Amino acid sequence: MRVKELEEENASLRAVIILKDAKIAQFESKVKELTERLNKNSSNSHEPPSSDGYGKKPAFPKSKGGKQGGQDGHKGGTLLMESNPDVTQPLIPLVCDCGHDISNEPLIVGEQRQVHDIPRPKKEVVAFQQYNVQCPCCGKVNKGQFPAGVNSAVQYGTRIRTLSVLLNTDYKIPVKKISSLLGDLYGITPNEGSIMSNNRRCYEILEPVEHRIKEEIKSSAVAHSDETGVRVEGKLHWLHTTSTLMYTYFYIHAKRGSDAITDACSIIADYPGRLIHDCYESYFKLTKAKHGLCGAHLLRELASQIDDKKAWAQLMSEMLLELLKQAKIDINQNIKNRVFIEKQYDIIISDGKKEEPPPQKSGKRGKYKRSKGLNLLERLEKHKESVLAHAFDPIIPFTNNLAERDLRPSKIKMKVSNTFRSIEGANHHARLAGFTSTLRKQNINVFSTIMDVFDGKEITFAQ
């Protein structure tokens, strides 16, 4: 009888142990997941650098013997002497240290030093005085014609309107601060309505210019696309960009994925070239485009797996970096060895699948839980051509950094202003920001060109 009780007790304890083992495994999985989340930073995930906080390590040189600061071959910007200065102030000694008068002695040219400064800000008021002349022949009174754009008794000129657009769009300064700045510098304080009206007018004039930018991008062999969240009226919207080395296009949409990418505002729905992006799944629904994946994003994801001691991730990371290095030195060597390179790529993926744990049942309905490493491996396998494209074609870049750089200023604007007050204001910013970004890529003076926009002059691009 006692034996039976002990057997029942033993079976009960075994059941408790099995249950606890399952709980422990569940907790260990949760701890691992939370630890991975805490260890995420901009070097091993898609997290932006701003999320690293004060614990971010300094950017020391990655290679031994490397140096910080400006690298060899870096173009400097030393301040140079002007051969024809605006003002020259003579510095002539009148009395010698011994007390003798030397004011009438011959001068010997000595050292010259220059101070480069800006003129003292001053408001300029131009009055257009109309005069009327009566014809002695027919008696008609002929009136002098005001210049185009001079429509009110008192109004702000083109330079002020240009500066307000530039400060708000390109330099991300809020409307109230623009008014304060102009007040401090020039003693004029345009109200919020005037400043926003300048943006709206510039936006309207630039419609055909934006159309030209879109056509240039659509006809390019390689384009970059990306998107980032922005606030419009307090709600999440998405700022999408498609760009090239010479042109930038932005548009605002309420959605991030397919609805936005195939919208009438988008220029990549029928894009036939090579589209570089961050492997966001919606982009692969664009069947007319060939794709290229951002190597920088892949390296960060691989870094996360390397942190978990995954041998396959180390091999894949080294392979991608070696292909990049070889493409810069002699891409023909990569092209010659293409079959071997693709075979090595396949071997790393095959070995990686053996190293990764198989999908685990999570206790919930639906698909089995897969490791992040396995998900990454299958993405690398599925999009092999897009991952390796840069290694065999010199016009295909390794990263999507171009699109990310184009979006970065708008993220700064969100940090400064937090939200766009209206969808109209967001659309104004998108078009104006795309225009100024295009000008800067082509080394065209932004201030002068916006003045030309307001003056009704034709806008021409360098390329």
Where are these regions (language model features)?
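Short, flexible loop/hinge motifs at secondary-structure junctions
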Residues: M1-S152, M196, S225
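Catalytic center-proximal scaffold of phosphoryl-transfer enzymes
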Residues: I18, N132-Q134, G139-Q463
